[in-house]
Amino acid sequence: APLIAAQGIAILLEAGVPPGVVQLLPGQGETVGAQLTGDDRVRGVMFTGSTEVATLLQRNIASRLDAQGRPIPLIAETGGMKAMIVDSSAFDSAGQRCSALRVLCLQDEIADHTLKMLRGAMAECRMGNPGRLTTDIGPVIDSEAKANIERHIQTMRSKGRPVFQAVRENSEDAREWQSGTFVAPTLIELDDFAELQKEVFGPVLHVVRYNRNQLPELIEQINASGYGLTLGVHTRIDETIAQVTGSAHVGNLYVNRNMVGAVVGVQPFGGEGLSGTGPKAGGPLYLYRLLANRPESALAVTLARQDAEYPVDAQLKAALTQPLNALREWAANRPELQALCTQYGELAQAGTQRLLPGPTGERNTWTLLPRERVLCIADDEQDALTQLAAVLAVGSQVLWPDDTLHRQLVKALPSAVSERIQLAKAENITAQPFDAVIFHGDSDQLRALCEAVAARDGAIVSVQGFARGESNILLERLYIERSLSVNTAAAGGNASLMTIG
């Protein structure tokens, strides 16, 4: 990895990036990473790695604010239990790609036949020096990773789970195995999806069998893991595709194709829940996350430019913004709030789906959906209503502290709005479930809130902090992005080609 990074830096410098703008500091993450993220001069962190380390990074920067008094941005892309509801991509790069298949879910009727073919394919794999074109599987990253993977395999064996390992025997390869950190491709059969509690980052594929009538329960189990990076489904039945894509909580979903190799601008990549903070790499929201200031309409202008070339479906947006319309009508005697409702409603993009460019035989879409619940903290009525308007504009629910100010507002608001609000005791409100935070107040209160949010277990939650009276809330921080890539050729071809005359 350091050699690849060094080559990448060399290419950037050759392309004209000024010396000193980008720096390469190779070393152990525990030392170099901790030193960098702990430095007050660092104004943003982009991280790819484990969920546990991402959580530590969030806690490390939680007490710091930037020059504008805002929390330090953290973009974390982490791993997860990637499932495929029927593929054999698990062993590419020795299973060390963040979207590599971890759990293969096979319908009972095809399980035995598929496993027989998979075991045969594993036995034909060559494991050795990745510098040779004849090598199928290289080493894992280091001895610690090898030990962790082998410990997991042994644990599964001790539980009585069927474990199959195979690799093509070759004397030249065998000599390299003795000195390298190699793990033979491994197949482990599980009784239940929930048996796998954390990601195994290596050439290990777990298999779960399911009854065709239990597909909804299987998807619920996958969602319940809390991870949501990638999911694949192989089926020729449109109803099954709709069922999986409509209920799975994952950032990238693939239909009738492999799950690795996302392309910038075609399949924006990144997970949700325990698998990442967003925004998606290769998507239009990413660079905006790194800006300290920007025009409020900047994102809308960017998306409008894209919409001029590719169609956008905004049917869901109308349903999501009905509570916002009710708030706008209620604010007839509050012109400032009414104007904000109009502004947020025009800027909001939740409930939109966009067709992305891609190769013939493949359909790629990018959908923006609202986060489920947003914690809103303010000690002023106008700020509380500003936060409410922003959250309703994207279609999320609101979590308010149960105090006099917010109780009175709930009573005064129309039912279409108040039913989108939940109250919780202020002293333990950060223990409640929520997906994002909007705060108005002073910097000391903001630091304390960031530290409390960072101390939570589970998914990393970002905090937007503002001074009292500010209304430039970033709506894109309240979205969930989902990318769907469908191999249309597998279902009979690309019908759009018939329109070419």
Give the ranges of each region predicted by the language model.
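Active-site PLP-lysine loop of aminotransferase-like
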Residues: 48-50, 73-79, 88-105, 127, ...
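Adenylate-forming
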Residues: 55, 82-87, 100-101, 204-208
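Flexible glycine/proline-rich, aromatic-decorated loop/lid segments
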Residues: 60-79, 88-89, 253-264
